[in-house]
Amino acid sequence: MKKTNAMRLLDAAGVKYEEFEYDASLGISGTDVARTLNEDVNMVFKTLVTETNKGEHFVFIVPVAMELDLKKAAKAAGAKKVDMLKQRDLLPLTGYVHGGCSPIGMKTKLKTFIDASAMDKEYIYVSGGKVGLQIKLSPAYLVKLTDATAIDIVKSAVLQ
C-alpha cells in the first residue's frame, strides 16, 4: 500500500499504529466504516473541519455515532459561532477529501480538539488520509501529534 501523508508523519514520529483498508463501496459513513472494521462505533472517530464567521478554521475529532455540538465547539475555539466547512473547501485547506480527511498531516496546521471520551480508550480509529483507509492508534499519541485539546464537544448519540 502506498503511504499517505498521515502514515508518513506517524512513521517519522515513531508512533505505533495499524492501518486497515476497507471497501469504500460498502459506504463511507462512520457507522459503515465501524461495521466494516467489526468495531464498536465508539472506537471509530470522524474528523470534522469548521469555519468561523472570521474565516478561522478548527478541527474536531468525535466518535462517529455522536454529533458535534456546534455551541460547545465555538466555545472551545473561542469563537462566537462555528459552522461546518463547505465540502468544496476541504481539499484546498486540508489536502484531504471528504470521507478521507485525517486529523494527521493536514496541509494547513489547524487548532484541533478531540472529544474527551477518546482519552479513556486504549486505541481509536481515525481516517488514514484517503477514502478506504483507517488508522488504529493510541489517542494519547494522536493528541501529542496533532497538539489537540481533549474536551467535551459532542451533543448526543445520533446513530447506532
Language-model region placement:
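Extended, low-hydrophobicity, polar/charged segments
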Residues: M1-Q160
